[in-house]
Amino acid sequence: MGNNVVVLGTQWGDEGKGKIVDLLTERAKYVVRYQGGHNAGHTLVINGEKTVLHLIPSGILRDNVTSIIGNGVVLSPAALMKEMKGLEDRGIPVRERLLLSEACPLILDYHVALDVAREKARGAKAIGTTGRGIGPAYEDKVARRGLRVGDLFDKATFADKLKEVMEYHNFQLVNFYKADAVDYQKVLDDVMAVADILTGMVVDVSDLLDQARKRGDFVMFEGAQGTLLDIDHGTYPYVTSSNTTAGGVATGSGLGPRYVDYVLGIIKAYSTRVGAGPFPTELFDDIGEFLCKQGNEFGATTGRRRRTGWLDVVAVRRAVQINSLSGFCLTKLDVLDGLKEVKLCIGYRMPDGREVTTTPLAADDWEGIEPIYETMPGWSETTFGVKARSGLPQAALDYIKRIEELTEVPIDIISTGPDRSETMILRDPFDA
């Protein structure tokens, strides 16, 4: 039996993590976010009602679950308050269910201004960030000048620290990026207005998780973005600013790494990517348009159209290695319904003619790569809403089996629609 279960994306994000986390939290006592910020977009559909969460863990909708934002998350007070209000307006008692680490770095207005100014300065070489200040906030953390939730316990000292760091960043904004300075007093007033709310939710997360482990409580760790966007293992520099891999659980929450029992990798039945960066299987034809339309591939956070392509098994195998995956959850299988044939990328042909079965690390090394495909029959029958494996078309079952063979990882959960109920749990991670 696994008490501590990690759910993370195996591709470039947008794999459908939010629904699966919400489904599995039926048995969990705690749900923990351990990296990223409000650049995530987790969509839940429960009894036909759609909820999009960006910062708050997906367990917040359940009254028997405590949601935790760990130290690895960069926290925007403004974004948190907006998200809390939206949920509280629907009668969800967020403040009774949400806890924060005092070590969470804060995202403030100057981080957003820097993010936007830098992307503008990059021009055609823009990374494609969400413009929400995530990268600059992590940068401040590593430079040891960042302000954290815990700093709000001493408001006078916080004000002094804020003034110092804003002088530094405003100098950059005005003199290097030729942008407007950010107003110190407004930033201070805005954060002080919510300081007591934030500090009122602070808890020692590492100790809480250790006590939960000793009691045998079930804990779900909710990843944001995807493995191929990891700051170290992703398609650098077209990556996010945090560790999206399973290793980020320990550093971003304070749980000892030996205590992770099961790692569930969410894998979409095809590939998508938002923003710039390598994407060997990207489709620019009618099939690519079909996948986008059928899969409603528009970002929950930015609204941007996602790039679409065939499932890249080579890239997913890298995710298997890095995360030591225990099992997969396959999502959006129904999007492939109606295609005469489906393809899996099983290797890459390099510019010099070599054939390889592993991914490069640096983005430049992806230049000129051609996907090597294995083609399989498609299926005309619908898989949407199917709730038993026996109800799937044989061609869909063959597709699932081939993914398992190529990755050497079992598919333990199959999602056939956006609602909680449209899911087949073949092996429950908490029972594995």
UniProtKB/Swiss-Prot annotation:
Binding locations of IMP: 14-17, 39-42, 130, 144, 225, 240, 304
What SUPFAM superfamilies would the database entry show?
Answer: P-loop containing nucleoside triphosphate hydrolases
- Provide the binding site for GTP: 13-19, 41-43, 306, 332-334, 415-417
Which PROSITE patterns would you find in this protein's record? ADENYLOSUCCIN_SYN_1 (PS01266), ADENYLOSUCCIN_SYN_2 (PS00513)
| CDD domains found in the cross-reference section | AdSS
Q: Where is the active site?
A: 14, 42
Q: What is its main location?
A: cytoplasm
Intrachain S-S bonds: none
What is the official name of this protein in its record? Adenylosuccinate synthetase
Q: What is its EC number?
A: 6.3.4.4
Q: Where in the cell is it found?
A: Cytoplasm
The task this protein performs is described as: Plays an important role in the de novo pathway of purine nucleotide biosynthesis. Catalyzes the first committed step in the biosynthesis of AMP from IMP.
UniProt enzyme class: ligase
